[in-house]
Amino acid sequence: MTAQAKLMQYRDADCFGATLDHTIVRDLPRDPAIKRILIIKWGGMGDIVISTAIMEDIRLAFPQAELHLNTMPAWQSLFTHDPRFSRVWCVNLQQQPGRWRAYRQWLAEVAAMQYDLMIDLQTNDKSRSLLTMLRLMGKAPALLLGNHPRFPYTIHQRQRLPQAHGFQIMQQTLLCAGIPLRTFAPKLHTPPSSVASAGQLLAGHALQHKSFVVFLCGSHASGQTKRWGAKHYADLVAHYVQQGMRVVLLGGRDETEECLAIASQHPQHVVNLCGQTSLLEVPVICAQAAAIVANDTGTAHLAAATSTPMTVICGPTNPLRVKPLGQQVLALQLDVPCKNCYAKQCSHHSCMQQLTPQRLVPYLAEPKHA
């Protein structure tokens, strides 16, 4: 008889264990000449949400500065009502064709604003290339902060953390610039309109405070292997029904079929809100839930902005690098030989198929009624 793979548990202490260098390369908060700052952060939803903790520390370090954010169009709505930023602007740098036109537009936007400090929280090949062009044009500020020890950055940490969680990599960037670390959870600013609309949605389905659990059961269309599977989630519904709970499904267009498959198995106990919420309504709903079960997906990071206990199921992705922030978040992963493969396709999907609802249940946070 083949032994079962061990189910591994990951908390913040497991995922954020890299030793950070507290050496200050340049103490930027003490520089009175810094009046206007640009933060660059593109990436996926999860990466964006994690970076909001870093953005908060930047805001706290420069309380009088004018702060701008450059992000991707898909995430602009997360910051529309964010009082930390005087300006949030986007250029679609992913468009094909028209890429070079977008690059020229981006360079012109940055040059026109005459920033005193630019903080590159993206620090990938594309952002480095654009900042290099900006410097060669003579339009870059003297203060360019990034986590890569190469041109074009004028300030960067002395050590690299290639295997660390993205949150710690960004923290290290702040430390070398003398920016204190004070924020350790996502920091989103939700407008009253989103709170009200989410409340109306819950009331319309008679969903009371702490009377339901949330399943974040999908993923981006390109990350199908990160899904635990509709059958597993449908089977898990019964566990919560026995405790007098209803189940709410949240997700976007890429997750419609997954949510329909689950809801069709339990029409009396599942409320399918997939595709019916804005991004900022997700944490509002999750804050009202008794518990959350999620895949490694961007919406799990939105949910981590709340205090609701959440279990995140990982398989092909490394929980040490993708776990959402928060002591209330537990990441689980079967210790199979092929874990952390990051494959987009898989013929056996052992990391998810072998993790049955029966094995998962003992690790779930017990939902408490209001």
Task: Say what each PLM segment does.
Residues 1-370:
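Catalytic machinery of carbohydrate-active enzymes
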